[in-house]
Each structure stands twice: as C-alpha cells, then as structure tokens.
Amino acid sequence: MRVLLLGLFFMMKPLLYLSLLSPCFSWAFCFDEAGRFYNVDPQLLKSIATVESSLKPNAYNENKNRVGEVVSRDFGLMQINSHWFDRLSEFNVNETNIYHPCFNVHLGAWVLSSNFSSHGYNWNSVGAYNAGFSKRTENARKIYIQKVQSVYFKMNVQ
C-alpha cells in the first residue's frame, strides 16, 4: 500500500498543475491515469463517480445511524468515506486535499483495486465500494451494482 500511495503522491504534482489549466481535461486524464495505475477500467471509475457524486468534485455526504448521529462522511467525486482517513493519514489525506479531483479519483481507484485484490475482479467487489462485503449489506450492494452497471453500460454503448 505504501508504494502505491507514494507513487500516487509523486504523480499528483503535475496533475495539480494540469487541473488548474483545464479542469475538464484533467478529470478525463485522471480517470485514465488512475485506471492504468491500479488496473481498473477508467470507464468503471467514471461510472462509480457518476453514481456517487454526479461527477461533482465538491460533493459531500453525511452517513447517519438510526438515531441521526453522523457516523461517517463521504467526500468528492468518488465519495471517499472518512473511515479511510486513519489508514491514509501518513500520506496527508485530509478534508482539504480529498476534494482535489485527481487525488480523489486515485483514492477511489485504490479502494476499488483493494476490493478486487481481496474478493476478485467482479461486480460484487464493485458493489462493496459502496456497501462493503458484509452479509448484512448484501441488498444495498446489489442495488448499488445495478446503478453502476446502468451507467457503465450506457457509457460503453455510446
């Protein structure tokens, strides 16, 4: 994990400059670059970002428990969940840089790639991006899979 994230850190500097010049270009480049780096289909990453945030880089969501307490938060294009922050703190992931589109896409690709590594390159691993692998969240995972597949197949038909 350390090597992958260090690679991400060094790749991000030129991408930061590119995004200042042309945000639309850099977003497309970021999905492609993250896909190559983590061996994940860039169209799948873009489909997830579409479902998660409607491609809004400043998207923010609070996840609440049954009594209305905030238990976690989701940030940016890929809606990176705050539970990852402790694991990524040594790489300076915080509530400011998480909104940078390229950085956010790379983090999302890392999460998805981790799912593929642990549970196989399949739709269940895609569903776990949002709902985890728990038996308790199986229905939510299936619903999420359908949403992502719908976007993904529409993108690939065009």
Language-model features: locations:
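Sec-dependent signal peptide recognition
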Residues: R2-L6, F10-L20
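Detector for methionine-enriched segments
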Residues: M1, M11-M12, M78, M155
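Catalytic glycan-binding domains that act on GlcNAc-containing polysaccharides
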Residues: W27-Q158
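N-terminal signal peptide c-region/cleavage motif recognized by signal peptidases
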Residues: P23-F25
